[in-house]
């Protein structure tokens, strides 16, 4: 390994933000970029009525709904590091891409609305990070509002998400009385001054917990309350331990308000100091270290129509090892074909720029006219496939029906291509000619209907179907599997890649099937 490669690897940090809708993820994303000086006027995410669209809104439908469906990638410098932030759609309208993006990062930032605590979507996303024990940092947001008791919030995270909390900063007051935060490890208090939009206020720092200046700055009552709470915190919570953090067992917790531009930098300081540089990854034959000289990478997401003027698709590839250089020849392992990549892109939400070189942890965009699939591995010749980029069992299902029955062939072609791209999953029941599509977020269905029309000239509508969940099935005992298939034919379907799946009408129905056929494995995820 060259020393240049080692230095580039060491300074990269690649992370994503997980949160429930409206916990402030979009604001945090902007403020993170602001502190990294990537967006000069943060606050480009405006109310639904305004025409100044957020930096990461591409497709028409996003513009209509004021949400970011697309998982964009933003790179910015911070201190001596280069940080890659992968945006994860956070609205009710999120998709399987959100889950898969979490497989491409080395660390996650969990944003929690401190007035509400742990919410449903956060739980789901945390489950996905558990597949790889991804390290988690936590930001308790909206301290400029009235929040729940901070100790209660920590307890809730520990009990519900099964991860220990190690507070790094601690709030002084909240809402109208919010005065700032105390840093437990630096023994410093940062006094809150609201910075709105893109002004970052100079923050006044008071050294020492027992400094009389602290009482003068925040008032004696709040200063005493802080000292009392810290006694309790030190007794009741975890100390920060980097090893446990890297193992995904404890999360450092920061308090602040993204809207007020306060506290985000404390979290970023923690991120660049503690989060891992690009990590090794498993393939089906061996482990690949980031420091290896030979280039490797995998595709975790494909996005259609990022440029309204061009009907192209862009495949997002995470660089795992080596160095990408413009014009290099790479092998697409699935097809065993060599391709010259001369026009890879990097992204600063919405603006594409062509890249000359990229290192482990970076995300490249590859132009793709339907030849790249999710989970594809690219190498400099070695035949191996990265694992851990799964399909997730859909949670919502619809039947797709054609307005013109003669277009069945185009419909099937379109749906299979969209499923290879990860836009939706398609299931073809064995016992009838229905086409069932499965998704993780409601918006995926609208996207599919819109794309079938614009890209495949197929007019389709979707309607409800009596399906609650799906599981991929396999069984080591061929005879028992045949019996299972014979007796459950009406509930079996093939997915877009011709893998067999069990389509359950209810969770009870699924549990009964699992009890009745203990030798059959019902999988919630499936490797690409």
Curated annotation (Swiss-Prot):
Where does the record say this protein resides?
Cytoplasm
**Main subcellular location of this protein, as a coarse class:** cytoplasm
Domain tr-type G, which positions?
Answer: 10-279
GO molecular function terms here?
GTP binding; GTPase activity; guanosine tetraphosphate binding; translation release factor activity, codon nonspecific; translation release factor activity, codon specific
Q: Which GO terms describe its biological process?
A: regulation of translational termination
**What InterPro entries does the record point to?**
EF-G-like_DII, EFG_III/V, G_TR_CS, P-loop_NTPase, PrfC, RF3_C, RF3_dom_3_sf, RF3_GTP-bd
Keyword terms, alphabetized = Cytoplasm, GTP-binding, Nucleotide-binding, Protein biosynthesis
Instruction: Please give an example of a GO cellular component term from this record.
Output: cytosol
Protein residues bound to GTP:
19-26, 87-91, 141-144
Tell me where on the tree of life, at the top rank, the source sits.
Bacteria
Please provide an example of a Pfam family that matches this protein in its UniProt record: EF-G_D2
- Write out the function statement from the record: Increases the formation of ribosomal termination complexes and stimulates activities of RF-1 and RF-2. It binds guanine nucleotides and has strong preference for UGA stop codons. It may interact directly with the ribosome. The stimulation of RF-1 and RF-2 is significantly reduced by GTP and GDP, but not by GMP.
Family, per entry: Belongs to the TRAFAC class translation factor GTPase superfamily. Classic translation factor GTPase family. PrfC subfamily.
This chain belongs to the protein called Peptide chain release factor 3
The species this protein belongs to is Escherichia coli O1:K1 / APEC
Q: What is the lineage of its organism?
A: Bacteria, Pseudomonadati, Pseudomonadota, Gammaproteobacteria, Enterobacterales
């Amino acid at each position: 390994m060259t020393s240049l490669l080692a230095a580039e690897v060491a300074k990269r940090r690649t992370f994503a933000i997980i949160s429930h809708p409206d916990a402030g993820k979009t604001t945090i994303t902007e403020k993170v970029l602001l502190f990294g000086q990537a967006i000069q006027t943060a606050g480009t995410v405006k109310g639904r009525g305004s025409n100044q669209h957020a930096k990461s809104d591409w497709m028409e439908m996003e513009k209509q709904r004021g949400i970011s469906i697309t998982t964009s990638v933003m790179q910015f410098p911070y201190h001596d590091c280069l940080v890659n932030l992968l945006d994860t759609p956070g609205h009710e309208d999120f998709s399987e891409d959100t889950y898969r993006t979490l497989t491409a990062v080395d660390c996650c930032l969990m944003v929690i609305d401190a007035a509400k605590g742990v919410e449903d979507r956060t739980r789901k996303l945390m489950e996905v990070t558990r597949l790889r024990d991804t390290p988690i940092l936590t930001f308790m947001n909206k301290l400029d509002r009235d929040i729940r008791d901070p100790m209660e919030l920590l307890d809730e995270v520990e009990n519900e998400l099964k991860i220990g909390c190690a507070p790094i900063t601690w709030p002084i007051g909240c809402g109208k009385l919010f005065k700032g935060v105390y840093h437990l490890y630096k023994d410093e208090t940062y006094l809150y001054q609201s910075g709105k939009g893109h002004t970052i206020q100079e923050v006044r720092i008071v050294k020492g917990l027992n400094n009389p200046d602290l009482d003068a700055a925040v008032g004696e009552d709040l200063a005493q309350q802080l000292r009392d709470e810290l006694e309790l915190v030190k007794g009741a919570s975890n100390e920060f331990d980097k090893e446990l953090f890297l193992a995904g067992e404890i999360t450092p917790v920061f308090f602040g308000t993204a809207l007020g531009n306060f506290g985000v930098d404390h979290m970023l300081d923690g991120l660049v100091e503690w989060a891992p540089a690009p990590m090794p990854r498993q393939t089906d034959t061996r482990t690949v270290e980031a420091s290896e000289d030979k280039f490797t990478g995998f595709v975790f997401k494909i996005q259609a129509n990022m440029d309204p003027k061009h009907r192209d698709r862009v495949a997002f590839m995470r660089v795992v090892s080596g160095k990408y250089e413009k014009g290099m020849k790479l092998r697409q392992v699935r097809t065993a074909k060599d391709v010259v990549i001369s026009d890879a892109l990097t992204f600063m939400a919405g603006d594409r720029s062509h890249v000359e070189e990229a290192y482990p942890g970076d995300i490249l965009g590859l132009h793709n006219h339907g030849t790249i699939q999710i989970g594809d591995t690219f190498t400099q010749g070695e035949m191996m496939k990265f694992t851990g980029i799964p399909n997730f069992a859909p949670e919502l299902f619809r039947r797709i029906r054609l307005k013109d029955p003669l277009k069945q062939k185009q419909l099937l072609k379109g749906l299979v291509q969209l499923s290879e791209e990860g836009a939706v999953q398609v299931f073809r029941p064995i016992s009838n000619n229905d086409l069932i599509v499965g998704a993780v977020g409601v918006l995926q269905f609208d996207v599919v209907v819109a794309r079938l029309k614009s890209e495949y000239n197929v007019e389709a509508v979707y309607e409800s179907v009596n399906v609650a969940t799906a599981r991929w099935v396999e069984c080591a005992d061929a005879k028992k599997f045949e019996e299972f298939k014979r007796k459950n034919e009406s509930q079996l379907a093939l997915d877009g890649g011709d893998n067999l799946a069990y389509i359950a009408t209810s969770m009870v129905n699924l549990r009964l099937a699992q009890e009745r056929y203990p030798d059959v494995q019902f999988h919630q995820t499936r490797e690409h």
